[in-house]
Amino acid sequence: MQERTYDITIIGGGPVGLFAAFYAGLRGMTVKIIESLSELGGQPAVLYPEKVIYDIPAYPALTGAELTQKLIEQLSRFDDRIAVCLKEEVLSFEKVDGDFVIQTSKARHYSKAIIVACGNGAFAPRTLGLDNEQLFADHNLFYNVHSLNQFAGKRVVICGGGDSAVDWALALDGLAKSVTLVHRRDAFRAHEHSVELLKNSHVTTLTPFVPLALEGENGFVNKMTIQKVKSEEEITLELDSLIVSFGFSTSNKNLKHWNLDYKRSSLLVSPLFQTSQEGIFAIGDAAAYEGRVDLIATGFGEAPIAVNQAIKYIYPDRDNRPVHSTALID
């Protein structure tokens, strides 16, 4: 027996996919979300749950975990018409008798339209590249931070020079016993305001240095030797916790097999977010067009447009003029 055919299937359960699902529910659509990870929320939930986000409209500051919780709470209003499938990777899809058949790593799904909101795809941390690094990865060497409190009273060394590295250093300043930030360049790549805060903090910065060796025992790293760039100078740092903040590599490997026009790891879209195949739309970092700004807020603005276009595609003879949410929710 064939599974139920949904109006819209959203590939990706990150912030943009969740808001698209909410808006589709608001418009009365049945929706299925297919997410490759074991939880909803995407990178903010999985990689940066305690990192503070400052560029979400109407929220001066909130963490990745808080953003995810609010989006899921918003979505729960339409639990009766929204299905969620976790730990499923979309392998391919094809159009059969006017509807889409979506093949995942676990099952087949059926949908009248598709919105791709999978961001830049699967992600994995960039490592130090040291031989014995993975010996400590399950204990006190971290590539992302799930709880700031686990570093309370500890000597923390952070490697990296971007926004995440600087943000973690500032967040741990005063909570950890000491914070040392190691970067391979003299200049940090973080936002100017954050760099100014760093200069006025108690964080020790060591630049330009690169990691050279790790020492430890019983799976716990307790020393890291760093070397100054273009120099023989070496420093050995004693530590309790090591955070590697070199960012994450991403891959949308299956995207190339979807028979859609793409550029690098994103799908080329029209001004109305339709891909090269009618009935399939892309939003968020999964969409590529000139002038796009890679912000969550950008994707939030794209979602209603894509949903409305999907509804027009599914029900071309219906009066599809969108109305304000105040008229739809009591």
UniProtKB/Swiss-Prot annotation:
Record has NADP as a keyword: yes
Regions crossing the membrane: none
Lineage: superkingdom: Bacteria
Binding, FAD: E35, Q43, Y48, V90, F123, D285, T326
Gene3D superfamilies for the chain: FAD/NAD(P)-binding domain
Quaternary state and interactors: Homodimer.
Protein family: Belongs to the ferredoxin--NADP reductase type 2 family.
Name of this protein: Ferredoxin--NADP reductase
